[in-house]
């Protein structure tokens, strides 16, 4: 695994220190909590670099998914962080990324092997699991001892609803940096070619289907599809929420995919392909983003993360709208943060770096301008009205009412079962009802373990 060591300190000499802890993660929790308290006592608010410039230099490491541009992003962030906190040397380790469940498994393997990082990039998909396994430290003492710093960094400006997934059993395990929800991306050229108006916020299933059918046609020997039928956990959850359904019950102890509302939702998505013919058959090689930009897909459910690709391809003829209501209107979201692992030897410095990453104006405005949605209210209201899409403030509005996706500690196994049966359904190897019944049985067994 590739490990990049950065040397961006503004001090003359560095003291070498132990980077990783050994032994049981749970056994070290009390000791690291003690260290936090001691660090807080030594540097009460750390509201600027002067408060820690007299302390010994320390090294911490952050684990981050190896997505495009991750290395350049981290280099820039750490360099800026060290302008205020030169005595904290930050290294990073890039972890190959294919999905959140896969990334979480790799990260836990590192921790179990004694090579875990101090800070980790983690989404809502993983925080419950890390907390349940005793691998994440609560920030509550750090927050209480550093009220001025929280205000200075902008932590208090983070939208409380977006930050809620990182507050578990009355404790805070980091601050949300970014978030996404699924909205409908609309290819304005395709709409204009068929002289169809973009949908309004109050559209429903019938209006959606009417538009999708009108925008499905042949052009220059190529099929243009009105929309896409999603099969992934995150996007399907958004559709389930819009029909008063969900993968799990409220306390995430039982699967509810066999409910009439859930079966109705999955059947509707299936019918988009096989009954109405307005969506292509899902396949591993289906590049929906390029098809959307090429005008072969008119409406595509996606998150704000996709606007970077649209901008890189100079594609501007698009807008967004909330997903159509099925029986209700409910937005589903997922957020990401930088939890501190309980195996860290430097919890105070790790929490300081994590808080800066999540909330600082530099971090939010520099790297979330053309990426995920910023978590800070003021940054959303500053950035979204100035950029494409025109209806971008929809993200700010939905932050108030969006509901987090369900991410139990067994999420990796739950999504594996979910993906398996969605694949079987869309391959016509099992009916929607039978698939959802079997998925429910298997997921219930996982949750009961």
What are the roles of these predicted feature ranges?
Residues 83, 89, 113, 194, ...:
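Extracytoplasmic/periplasmic substrate-recognition and gating elements
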Residues 39, 43-52, 124-181, 319-321, ...:
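Hinge/lid segment of periplasmic solute-binding proteins
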Residues 156-157, 368-420, 424:
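Long, aromatic- and glycine/proline-rich binding clefts that accommodate carbohydrate-like moieties
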Residues 209-214, 251-282, 323:
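Glycine-centered hinge/linker elements that transmit conformational signals in sensory
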Residues 80, 84-157, 193-195, 291, ...:
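Extracytoplasmic "Venus flytrap"/periplasmic binding protein-like
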């Amino acid at each position: 695994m590739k490990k990049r060591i950065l040397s961006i300190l503004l001090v003359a000499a560095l003291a070498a220190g132990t980077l990783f802890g050994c032994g049981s993660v749970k056994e070290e929790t009390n000791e690291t909590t003690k260290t936090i308290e001691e660090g807080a006592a030594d540097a009460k608010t750390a509201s600027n670099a002067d408060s820690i410039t007299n302390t010994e230099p320390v090294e911490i490491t952050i684990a981050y998914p190896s997505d495009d541009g991750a290395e350049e992003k981290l280099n820039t962030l750490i360099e800026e962080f060290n302008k205020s906190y030169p005595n904290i040397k930050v290294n990073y380790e890039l972890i190959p990324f294919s999905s959140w469940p896969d990334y979480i498994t790799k990260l836990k393997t590192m921790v179990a092997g004694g090579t875990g990082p101090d800070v980790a990039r983690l989404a809502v998909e993983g925080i419950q699991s890390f907390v349940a396994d005793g691998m994440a430290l609560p920030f509550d003492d750090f927050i209480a001892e550093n009220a001025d710093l929280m205000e200075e960094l902008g932590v208090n400006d983070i939208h409380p609803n977006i930050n809620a997934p990182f507050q578990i059993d009355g404790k805070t395990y980091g601050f949300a940096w970014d978030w996404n929800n699924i909205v409908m991306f609309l290819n304005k050229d395709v709409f204009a070619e068929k002289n169809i108006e973009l949908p309004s916020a109050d559209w429903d299933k019938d209006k959606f289907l009417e538009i999708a059918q009108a925008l499905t046609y042949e052009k220059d020997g190529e099929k243009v599809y009105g929309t896409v039928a999603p099969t992934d956990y995150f996007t399907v959850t958004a559709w389930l929420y819009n029909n008063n359904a969900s993968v799990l019950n409220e306390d995430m102890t039982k699967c509810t995919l066999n409910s009439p509302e859930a079966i109705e939702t999955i059947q509707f998505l299936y019918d988009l392909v096989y009954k109405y013919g307005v969506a292509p058959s899902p396949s591993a090689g289906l590049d929906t983003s390029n098809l959307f930009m090429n005008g072969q897909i008119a409406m595509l459910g996606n998150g704000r993360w996709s606007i970077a690709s649209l901008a890189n391809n100079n594609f501007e003829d698009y807008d967004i709208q909330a997903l159509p209501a099925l029986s209700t209107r409910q937005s589903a979201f997922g957020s990401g943060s930088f939890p501190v692992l309980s195996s860290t030897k430097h919890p105070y410095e790790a929490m300081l770096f994590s808080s800066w990453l999540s909330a600082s104006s530099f971090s939010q405005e520099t790297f979330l301008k053309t990426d995920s949605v910023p978590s800070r209210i003021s940054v959303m209201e500053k950035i979204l009205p100035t950029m494409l899409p025109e209806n971008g403030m929809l993200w700010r509005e939905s932050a108030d009412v969006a509901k987090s996706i369900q991410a139990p500690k067994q999420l990796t196994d739950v999504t594996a079962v979910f993906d398996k049966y969605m694949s079987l359904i869309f391959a016509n190897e099992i009916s929607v009802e039978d698939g959802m019944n079997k998925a429910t049985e298997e997921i219930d067994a996982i949750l009961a373990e």
